Regions:
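PLD/PLD-like phosphodiesterase catalytic module centered on the HKD motif
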Residues: 1-125
Length: 125
């Protein structure tokens, strides 16, 4: 199983980005890959699985957004659509930079500490 997560390289909300980054090490340790996408800020939430199932929506893919927030999401069970979405995601990854455990560990301690503190407030961000 390959799980690729693509997030913006430059987030429009710095505090949210810092809180999100605090959890990257846990994701990478569980054999997922994280990519920082370059270019204009992209706020889309997309998911494609095995070229046969797709998800497009406004909600973040977390329990709070999926249960508590008023969002619009669409599940698509169409092979052509899912394959096209996978190709779009793959094109984004081609120009993205990989986030690595080594890169995360090499950041200054004060940055890592700040991110962990902000992560504590992430349910409110």
């Amino acid at each position: 199983v390959t799980v690729d997560i693509v997030v913006p390289d430059a987030n429009n909300l710095t505090l949210v980005d810092r809180a999100m980054t605090a959890q990257f090490d846990q994701i990478l340790k569980n054999y997922c890959r994280i990519w920082r996408a370059t270019g204009p800020f992209n706020h889309s939430k997309l998911m494609a699985i095995d070229g046969c199932w797709a998800y497009v929506g406004s909600s973040n893919l977390d329990p709070r957004s999926l249960r508590l927030n008023f969002e619009v999401d669409l599940e698509v069970l169409d092979r052509d659509f899912a394959e096209a979405l996978e190709k779009r995601i793959d094109r984004t990854i081609e120009t993205a930079s990989a986030v690595t455990l080594e890169g995360l560990r090499n950041r200054p301690f004060v940055v890592r500490l700040l991110e962990r503190i902000l992560w504590l407030g992430s349910p409110y961000l």
